[in-house]
Amino acid sequence: MSATPSLWNGKGLSIVCIPFTSFTPDGLEVRLDGVAAQAEFCVAAGNDVALLQGTTGEWPSLSLQERIDLAKEWRRCIPLGHAMKLILHIGHDALVDAITLARIAAVRRNAPDWPALAHRGAPPVLTPAMVVPP
């Protein structure tokens, strides 16, 4: 069976790491000090991609600032020049916050791109621009 070339590495199937977010024992604060060990593990295991805050279900529990801090810490912890791509989950109930996260996702550091995954866990938001005829 031949693998379809991956969007990420162009050679074959990518290995995607879906890390959990570490919290303090009381569950009230995010622990950024665990990100470096997670990133090191994912890199050493040969992962091509890390999907942040997207699939393990913790994103609705995080404040906007916590999500930004986590994204920046992950980006900081991937070794400069390493090929691992990061996908940032940008879904949010507030449109302005989703835009803020999308802007964070657009910042590039050690890879040609930092894709953003948009996902909404709540009903869609309608803005006046969407319902007022041109």
Q: Where are the regions a protein language model picked out?
A:
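Active-site beta->alpha loop and helix N-cap motifs at the rims of alpha/beta catalytic domains
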Residues: 2-134
